[in-house]
Amino acid sequence: MSEKKNLFRLALSKLAEVKTYWKTPPSGKYVPFKEIAAYSVGGAGVYFIYSLVGQITLNAGSMIVGASIGIDAIDLQTMNALSILLGFLIAPARAMMFDNTRSKMGKFRPYILYMGLPTAIFSTAFVYMPYETMDYSKKCITVFIFYTLLQFFSPFYQAAYAGLVQVLSPNSAERGWIIEISSIIYSFAPTVINPVLPLIGDLENIQTYRIAFPIFCLLGIFVSMFCVFGTQERIIVPKSYVQKVGFIEGLKKVSKNKYFWIVNSSNWLGFLAGGAGYIFQWIFYYGMNNSSLYALMVVIKGEASTPGMALAAPLMNKFGKKKICLFSLSAQVFCLIMMLTCYKNYILVFVFIFLKDMVGALSIIYLPAMNADMMDYQQYKTGDRLEGFIGQTGPLLTSAISLVTGYAIPLILKNFGLTNNYSDLYDGDFRNPIVKAMIVYSIIGTLLSLIPYLFYDLDETKRGSMIKALKVRALFEDRLRNEISEEALVDTMKDIIEAEEILKNETEHKKADIDAAKIILAEVSKFTDSSSGSRINLELLKEEYFAKVNAEA
């Protein structure tokens, strides 16, 4: 009974906390709960649309394009390669538009507002094309045209939502918490869509998608408006800062970001891991041949992500992003190895698929958190907020590499006799060798994708010191223009004085704290050393700081 009372009291205290900080953030934080709710609920709208667009893929796992419309797996990859080549023209423009956008709404929210509707319209129009009356070549042309249109609008839409969280707060821990909350809420969209589709009709039947797409797209447009009009972008820059970055200049600056290369090289090395995405559908949709039971299993499988997402932020805060990342990938390898021993046993293989998805869901939190830290490092390194260039250059390079690596899985499937004859997957003798091969290649791909993260060294102490260095930069540049605020003065000078105290007594502090203090004071020296012309009088700023603190006391 006492345990229930304690839980009840805890729930009441949390509700009281939400009420208290609904419009005003807690001390030391930047984002009120109202804004977190708007970002999270709006994200469900974005993902209603994005999850449907995700059904339209040019690979062997696409039930719409492969099984329903009937395009050969090799032809799908060839169309994908052509789309990638066109993307080389689109992605740079998208990057420049993101990073040079200057509007009252910020740099990301305008694209959520304006790119959602065309994404919804073209995806719905795609499934309503009369494929039943088309010959094979016309099907290929139609699919390619619509896919190319979607690849212009959809990445704007999804990247804008993903990028928005990176500028909601400069506090990494707070960002991680927002990502966790929003991920749990917006995952409601695919959690609903994936089991509903097989209940509407067969996944090989285009009529199923003609019912689902307009309903969920319309719902998505309306719900996504919450994050457009209910959030605010916050970045630490001087008041006079106006960013304008050219394409070549942006690429040069991004190339100096080592964490950009670490995160993206993991994607490049892990191309074989994509085979794991086919396993569940092939084993349970084709193997069990029961749409209702398959829909139930999709619901259960979808819930595997929830504990992973819920645990990710506290685990990251305790162990750091790198350790959680390595644990997630290693645990997935273990689950794949176990699946290799039991893929013919529906119960056991489902257990390991569930566990793999659960530990894999940690990446839903730690990858955006790593990406946000990567943006902060970029600003610290070059002085620019390059979310657009980083967000588009990575996928662009990945696409270029996939012009070659993308043929690996289709060629493997072709070697096993699978092209567009998806109905043969109902036969266990045909299906099981392919499933086994996909598991083996997924193990190899996941192991390769783990290697780059061994070199990731941007821990919380180092990242926090970079944020403080950015505050120093903003404070001093504002000081030179007589635009300094008292709040910024107190906050930043406190960090500088603490850093000085650490270096005066190095023997009493950890190496990480000493290195962090050096990063902060190195930024100070850029504005105060004789080599810089002594532009800033640090002692005078200290006098102003202590006068302000004493006055408040």
Predicted segments with their positions:
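Membrane-embedded alpha-helical bundles of multi-pass transporters/translocases
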Residues: 7-482, 513, 525-552
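Flavin-dependent oxidoreductase catalytic core characteristic
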Residues: 519-522
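Acidic, Ser/Thr-rich low-complexity segments on the non-lumenal side of membrane proteins
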Residues: 484-515
